[in-house]
Amino acid sequence: MPQHSRYSDEHVEQLLSDLLNVLEKHKAPTDLSLMVLGNMVTNLINTSIAPAQRQAIANSFARALQSSINDDKAH
């Protein structure tokens, strides 16, 4: 069953585009981009989520990330 979001596709796509533009502007290689994005996620969880909920949110995020990874060999 598809998940529904309270955010429009357009809003999500615009944020994604803006974030990608920043990484491209700084010519960030993949490893640096992943490190920065991971640090951003950690910061958001640690500063915006109640301590009792942080582990559950991190686990949910990790599962969502893993399920969205494409297993094809092309890159």
From Swiss-Prot:
Q: Give the matching InterPro entries.
A: UPF0352, YejL_sf
Q: Where are the transmembrane segments?
A: none
Q: Which domain of life is it from?
A: Bacteria
Family, similarity comment: Belongs to the UPF0352 family.
List the HAMAP family hit by this protein, alphabetically.
UPF0352 (MF_00816)
What is the recorded name of this protein?
A: UPF0352 protein CKO_00587
Q: Which organism is it from?
A: Citrobacter koseri (strain ATCC BAA-895 / CDC 4225-83 / SGSC4696)
Source organism phylogeny: Bacteria, Pseudomonadati, Pseudomonadota, Gammaproteobacteria, Enterobacterales
